[in-house]
Amino acid sequence: MLKLTERINTIPGKFTLQESLKSSPISQVFLCTLNNTKAVVRFDLPSASLLAIDRRNEWILLKSIQDLRIAPRTLYQDTLQGLMIWEFIEGDQFLLNSANQESSLQSLGSTLSMIHGTSTPKESKDIFSESLHLYKNLLEDSSHKSLLQKTLSLYDELTADGINYVLSHNDLNKGNILWNQRCYFLDWEYAGLNHPGFDIASLVRTYRLNKNEFHELLSGYSMDNNRFNFDQITQWVVFSELLDEVWEKSVSLLAKNTFNKAN
């Protein structure tokens, strides 16, 4: 993978790199402009290629939901150089307050319903399942084996209810949800088929929703709400917390292995 400046030089058109927005163990994200359009660019770090995420798959999914206007419009991608550019969305972090809580939760549920009601493109990959398989291969012989087993066992238990998998975001947290007259979801790298309870639980966990607030969320979701009850979703919250730990351990191990190979 080329150095950052060399990767920038591969971008066609008039490109200007601006301030850093965020950094993670797998990527760096910056504000930028592309042909005078305000945009965001993400540069993958070496460890990104070792995860089960697939940038072409992310591009395909974003294109498939473009008309819903709930995600950024993609502008440019180069999988070889590990970069993607999408249009910047003006907005504020989605927050709940007493003045608008009911309508905000319903809007949040409605946006999630649009995703879950969208058909998954035939050529897309099952990123979530592939990620779980990768974590298993990485951790099953490590000191984190018990954490891994607890996480996977709970997932098997929760998904044994017969509910069909749907197109899911799989990474809904405060940093990935914006508000500007409507909800927008960002960072679709883990998107793909999954049990709908996972996304719902992610929102319950992120905003610490109580039982009444959970039902307000479901009133906006309105996709056979009888399938979900608060106790079930609470168990999904536990799973999401465990999965975050598994992800952190896995990424840390991959980063360590990458560093050791480089030295």
Segments and roles (model prediction):
Residues 22-123:
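ATP-binding pocket architecture of kinase catalytic cores
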